[in-house]
Amino acid sequence: MTIVEDPEGNETSTLHAMVDFKNRRILEVGCGEGRLTWRYANKAAHVTAIDPMAEDIETARANLPDRLKGRVSFAESTIEDFARSMPERKFDIAIFAWSL
């Protein structure tokens, strides 16, 4: 069975109506396989997407469109470990989609 997420674009249009991603540094917590990442990364200056599941991060990296390479980086990490390892990092926007 194939699952199509957001087939009508409601999630994507709502996200873009609420947030201006243009030239912003984004932290996406709980990125999973990157299903949301691709929907806004083309407008952001850079996206750091983290998830504690190694398999999901591997899938997200493997499926990263060529046009977004260099604009998106992935890390296998919890938010707590990420914050401890990089306390100096600054972001304009943090997204917690499907992660709470």
Protein language model regions, located:
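Short amphipathic alpha-helix with an adjacent loop that forms part of the alpha/beta core around
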Residues: D81-R89
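Conserved class I S-adenosyl-L-methionine
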Residues: R24-G32
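Local beta-strand N-terminus motif with an aromatic residue
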Residues: N23, F91-D92
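Conserved alpha-helix/loop element of class I SAM-dependent methyltransferases that forms part
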Residues: E5-R24
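A conserved beta-strand element that flanks and buttresses the S-adenosyl-L-methionine
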Residues: I95
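Short catalytic micro-motifs in class I SAM-dependent methyltransferases
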Residues: W98-S99
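Class I SAM-dependent methyltransferase SAM/SAH-binding core
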Residues: R35-F82
